[in-house]
A protein has these predicted regions:
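Short, conserved, GDST-rich strand-edge loop motifs in beta-rich repeat architectures
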Residues: 217-245
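Residue position within the beta-strands of beta-propeller blades
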Residues: 67, 120-121, 166, 215, ...
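Structural signal for beta-propeller blades
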Residues: 73-75, 127-129, 172-174, 221-223, ...
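Short loop/turn segments immediately following the C-termini of beta-strands
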Residues: 70, 80, 123-124, 169, ...
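Beta-rich, blade/repeat-based domains predominating
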Residues: 48-62, 99-115, 147-163, 194-211, ...
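Short loop/turn segments immediately following beta-strands, especially the blade-tip
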Residues: 32, 79-87, 131-138, 176-184, ...
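A short beta-strand motif characteristic of beta-propeller blades
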Residues: 41-47, 91-100, 141-146, 187-194, ...
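Bacterial N-terminal signal peptides
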Residues: 10-19
Length: 396
């Protein structure tokens, strides 16, 4: 969901900074001072030393919950019953990180209880899906890698179809692979086209009971771009289509949908209160859909069969909830719980499945002490200085 800098802007800013560095070196040389270089300690820095949660998944069979950490580039696993004692940091059971893992700007995460595998997709940079065993720790190599389209975000699995579905932001697509696909492998099918209603898709669920796929859309429709790169879906047209800014939505498709398939249902409109919907989860037993509503710090719950401009049947929001820029959401129907991962404050929250209103979470998992500031870094790629306001500008 982060704002992305344009390549030209990044190159321009990079050129400006390089010029400033060269000019500074020349000034130092003229003054007789030795040239700057080497292992220089910065005068000051803005950084976040703590993990920041993005995606989240829960496995009630093996009592595991896992989160993707977009800041320290890791995957973290906890006991499902873990809690932050006395407001302190919750120690994970395992944390996979390091160059061998291929974990980078990681987004959606998925747990496979049967095979005890943790799957995650890298979003803006690595363009891969990483598969690790549950017991992976430290700088562990993945058991398999799959090349996926650039800006993959959400991840869902169908045990009936033995397939994996991945949302792709910039391609306005859902790409579907064999569950055990690896290396560079074409998708089995995809959902994409002007009738599909996908617009900057993020969260996704696959409901095997009703054979449906649901997708959360920000509404930023970029058009069907031509340049798709390796491993991406074909466009079906030689010319890019014009983009549009659409209202956010949740679109639901048949689990067998492919190509330019129309949604079976669409939740969209002012009454829905959708605002930058991120993670999406379904409760097939209670016929409900839950979404992490990042734009207004809430969790919205809709009827599974909702259609059109409809209000949520429940909303979790308010100061007591601790919801702060929610990114991921997971439903544990076995234990009757909703899990929410916060991007805004180094925490994951657990609520009762039927929670509503301004209610406190049952449990909290923390990667930093309460009240620790969060700079909010996602994927900064450039920097500029506003000399008039004396401010540093960072496209995130």
């Amino acid at each position: 969901m982060m704002l992305r800098s344009r390549t030209g802007v990044a190159l321009l800013l990079g050129g400006i900074l390089a010029f400033v560095a060269v000019y500074a070196q020349e000034k130092r040389a003229a003054s007789g001072s030795p040239p700057a270089g080497g292992d220089i300690i910065p005068l000051r820095q803005v950084s976040d030393p703590y993990p920041v949660f993005n995606g989240i998944a829960v496995d009630p069979v093996n009592n595991v919950v896992a989160m993707s950490d977009v800041n320290r580039k890791s995957l973290m696993s906890y006991s499902r019953s873990a809690v932050s004692s006395s407001g302190g940091i919750t120690t994970p059971q395992r944390q996979a990180f390091g160059p061998l893992t291929n974990i980078g700007f990681v987004a959606g995460v998925l747990l496979d209880p049967q095979r005890k595998e943790l799957l995650a997709v890298n979003n803006d940079i690595e363009d891969t899906m990483v598969v690790l065993p549950y017991d992976a720790q430290g700088n562990a190599a993945p058991s398999r890698l799959l090349s996926v389209p650039h800006q993959a975000w959400g991840l869902a699995m169908s045990r009936t179809h033995d397939q994996i579905a991945i949302t792709v932001e910039i391609q306005e697509a859902v790409v579907i692979y064999k569950r055990d696909a690896k290396n560079v492998e074409a998708p089995m099918r995809y959902i994409r086209g002007p009738n599909a209603g996908l617009a900057d898709p993020h969260g996704i669920f696959w409901d095997d009971r009703h054979n449906e796929i649901g997708v959360a859309n920000h509404g930023n429709f970029r058009g069907l771009v031509k340049n798709v790169g390796g491993g991406c879906v074909p466009t079906g047209t030689a010319e890019p289509e014009s983009g549009a800014v659409l209202p956010p939505s949740i679109t639901v498709y048949s689990g067998d949908a492919k190509g330019d398939a129309k949604p079976l249902r669409t939740i969209q409109g002012e009454k829905t209160k959708l605002d930058f919907p991120m993670g999406l989860a379904e409760d097939a037993e209670h016929d409900e859909i839950a979404v992490a509503n990042n734009g207004d710090n809430s969790v919205l719950v809709f009827s599974r069969t909702a259609q059109g401009d409809v209000a949520p049947i429940r909303t979790i929001a308010g100061a007591k909830t601790g919801i702060n820029r929610p990114m991921g959401i997971a439903l544990d129907t076995t234990n009757g719980e909703i899990w929410v991962s916060n991007f805004g404050d180094h925490a994951a929250l657990v609520f009762d499945r039927s929670a509503s209103g301004d209610v406190a979470p049952k449990r909290v998992i923390r990667t930093a002490p309460p009240g620790t500031p969060s700079p909010g870094f996602g994927n900064p790629q450039a920097v500029a200085y506003d000399s008039k306001r004396e401010q540093i500008l960072v496209p995130n």
